[in-house]
Amino acid sequence: MLFQVGGEGTRPTFFEMAAAQQLPASLRAALTYSLGVFALRRSFLHKILDYEDEFFAALMLILEGHSLRTTDGSFAESLYGLRRKSARLRLRKDSARKDSSEEVQHSGLEKRQRILSVVFLVVLPYFKSKLHAIYNKEREARLRESLWGAEDQGFDEADFFTGDDSIVSREPSGNEELSVRVQLATKIKKFIAVCYPWIHASSEGLSFTYQLLYLLDATGFYSLGLQALGIQVCRATGQELMDTSSRISKIRNHERERLRGPPWLKTVQGALLSCSYAVLDYAQTGLIAAVFIFKMMEWWYQSAEERLSAPTVYPPPPPPPAPKMAKEGIPLPPDRSLCALCLQKRANPSVVTVSGFVFCYSCVFKYVSKYKRCPVTLIPASVDQIRRLFQDT
């Protein structure tokens, strides 16, 4: 069995399908992060972040609906040059061999398939994100209660399925009796918290199975939703792209012809339609380009801030000038390896730290102990300012 990774024919590769599937999630993460940064200076954006799921669902509803209506492909699929086609199996008979085989026939999408595609692309992910949020809240509540030793068991399975009606309120006024509505909401949240892990595991397992079968070229459907709708994703040919452009032009001309009212109202409506068409035409590339530019600017300013916040490293200062030799001091020998006191090669070299001159340890120790000064510069010194030097062999 061969892996389906090549780019031949109208069948998209596994990597094209995976990239198209992951694009909406990546786009949502980038938009959420961008809005979070802008909300630091524009407080009204916090209202959008409070309804993040609804905002993104409405945005994707517009983009997906427009893309399916004009290009027969989802928002992400149209970026990769992919199209959705209705797939029907037809039994093909071979009279010579007297056997039969199945042949897939592709045709344009029906209205029902477009509507259900929007449901699978927008509505179901929206409900899944809401269920995931409820599950996380209930899980955090249970962990918090277990940490503080609360009596409420959160979404414990045994507590739910045994039908125990004793519900402890998480509010400070826990002794008050909860209303029927609150009790029902609590039961629903418990039910979601118990069932969501199984729903999520089943969904991910089916998704992985279909993706593996698609990679192995064992099926033409990339997901269960596509098979349920009878839709296969194919590469768009050059002729299909031209037909799509002409179809979009016909749809827009028909919408302009349907305008009614006085001339000034038609002009306003036509201008609004032109603006909406321009926004929808450039929404795909413009949205992704805006996020890309924002991330580039963020990286640029972050690098500049790191450079400004980094400690300034100055070059090391030049060494101080050597102390001058006193006229009454002991002169230095021409050979620098000789001791100025005994005029012999230095044994156990030691330095006087106040001046930096090196002598034999025994010679300089006796001299400094007696005269309390450096032999060459006559700078006051003590035996505590004598340091022995050791050389690596």
Curated annotation (Swiss-Prot):
Pathway: Protein modification; protein ubiquitination. GO terms for cellular component: peroxisomal membrane; peroxisome. The chain crosses the membrane at residues 14-41, 45-69, 111-148, 169-214, 286-312. It holds the Pfam family Pex2_Pex12. Zn(2+) binds at residues 339, 342, 360, 363. Expressed in young seedlings, roots, leaves, seeds and flowers. Residues 1-13, 70-110, 215-285 are peroxisomal matrix. GO terms for biological process: embryonic morphogenesis; fatty acid beta-oxidation; peroxisome organization; protein import into peroxisome matrix; protein monoubiquitination. InterPro entries: PEX12, Pex_N, Znf_RING/FYVE/PHD. A zinc finger (RING-type) spans 339-378. It is a multi-pass membrane protein. Keywords: Membrane, Metal-binding, Peroxisome, Peroxisome biogenesis, Protein transport, Transmembrane, Transmembrane helix, Transport, Ubl conjugation pathway, Zinc, Zinc-finger. Disruption phenotype: Embryo lethality at the heart stage. Residues 42-44, 149-168, 313-393 are cytoplasmic. One of its GO terms (molecular function) is zinc ion binding. Its main location: membrane. Component of the PEX2-PEX10-PEX12 retrotranslocation channel. Interacts (via C-terminus) with PEX7. Interacts with DSK2a and DSK2b. The three subunits of the retrotranslocation channel (PEX2, PEX10 and PEX12) coassemble in the membrane into a channel with an open 10 Angstrom pore. The RING-type zinc-fingers that catalyze PEX5 receptor ubiquitination are positioned above the pore on the cytosolic side of the complex. The RING-type zinc-finger is degenerated and only coordinates one zinc ions, preventing E3 ubiquitin-protein ligase activity. Component of a retrotranslocation channel required for peroxisome organization by mediating export of the PEX5 receptor from peroxisomes to the cytosol, thereby promoting PEX5 recycling. The retrotranslocation channel is composed of PEX2, PEX10 and PEX12; each subunit contributing transmembrane segments that coassemble into an open channel that specifically allows the passage of PEX5 through the peroxisomal membrane. PEX12 also regulates PEX5 recycling by activating the E3 ubiquitin-protein ligase activity of PEX10. Belongs to the pex2/pex10/pex12 family. This is Peroxisome biogenesis protein 12.
